[in-house]
């Protein structure tokens, strides 16, 4: 690999969140980078790049925070966590979390122009803490609403419900799909017995925290990292049809390097060590690849999900 171009924001933040997530519009040759600290999207042109040089790119900032707060007086911006472009390049969606960690988020939906500019088409309310946004197709947008207990579990703290929001991009409507269907004593026990990690005395609808989504054949595969699981969402039915354990790693068989006292990589096996795989990120593709992120693919008529584990 050789670098042919780059963009420098000129900004720095000890907490991160500057130029964190990037989406590329193949139809217009523009990239959009998320700056969650400022609520800005930076539009960067990728036209006229050559393999012979190292071009310093320029960017144009788009004030997503200001646009959304001006149009939706009930929303107080907290963070912009994700951005995605529709397959045909006509739409862009940005996921925004509320300032209040127990309040619903928003998905801002824009029309894309060939000059890189964006036109706000509408704002859709999502579940709590949308952490990732993805287009299932040109007309359907999904957000993974993580619902983390950001102030712990003490008195007065809230543990928000995790969910996935299904958005109709044309009608600008959203349906928040949660995990209430797994809250019965019988179904919760079945999840635990299958290897899914749940907090004691907590309902799955409260404890599960969607983080990332891969889409294939009308279904969304949703990583639940802390629960060591992947949930399957039927998009037509708008309901979760199953939650499946990612299993456990046997490090008496699989070598691992857990010694961080030096910079060397020296994996070895441990006779009595087991690990939780904790699936994290995902993206849909028809090709077989491995290692970060999760992938959805078709093989001999069956859908396969490939998930790298931390």
Question: Would you name each region that the model predicts?
Answer:
Residues 1-254, 270-296, 300-310:
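Mobile, glycine-rich extracellular loop/lid and propeptide segments
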């Amino acid at each position: 690999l050789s670098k042919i171009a780059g963009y420098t924001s000129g900004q720095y933040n000890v907490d991160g969140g500057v130029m964190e997530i990037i989406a590329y519009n193949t139809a217009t040759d523009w990239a959009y980078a998320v700056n969650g600290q400022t609520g800005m999207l930076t539009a960067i042109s990728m036209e006229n790049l050559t393999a012979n040089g190292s071009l310093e790119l320029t960017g144009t900032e788009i004030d997503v925070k200001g646009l959304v707060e001006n149009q939706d007086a009930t929303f107080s911006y907290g963070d912009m966590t994700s951005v995605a472009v529709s397959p045909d390049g006509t739409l862009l969606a940005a996921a925004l979390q509320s300032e209040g960690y127990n309040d619903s988020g928003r998905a801002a939906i824009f029309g894309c122009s060939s000059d890189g500019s964006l036109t706000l088409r509408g704002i859709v309310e999502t579940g709590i803490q949308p952490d990732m946004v993805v287009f299932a197709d040109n007309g359907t947008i999904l957000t993974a609403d993580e619902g983390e207990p950001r102030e712990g579990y003490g008195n007065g703290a809230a543990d928000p419900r995790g969910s996935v929001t299904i958005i109709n991009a044309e009608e600008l409507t959203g349906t928040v799909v949660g995990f209430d269907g797994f809250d019965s004593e019988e179904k919760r026990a079945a999840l635990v017995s299958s290897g899914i990690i749940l907090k004691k005395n907590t309902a799955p609808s409260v404890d599960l925290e969607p983080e990332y989504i891969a889409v294939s054949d009308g279904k969304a595969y949703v990583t639940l990292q802390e629960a060591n699981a992947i949930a399957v969402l039927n998009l037509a039915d708008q309901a979760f049809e199953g939650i499946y354990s990612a299993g456990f790693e046997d490090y008496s068989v699989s070598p691992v390097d857990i010694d961080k006292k030096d910079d060397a990589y020296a994996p070895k096996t441990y006779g009595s060590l087991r690990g939780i795989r904790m699936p994290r990120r995902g993206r849909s593709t028809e090709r077989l690849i491995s290692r970060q992120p999760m992938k959805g693919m078709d093989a001999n008529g069956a859908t396969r999900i490939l998930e790298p584990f931390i």
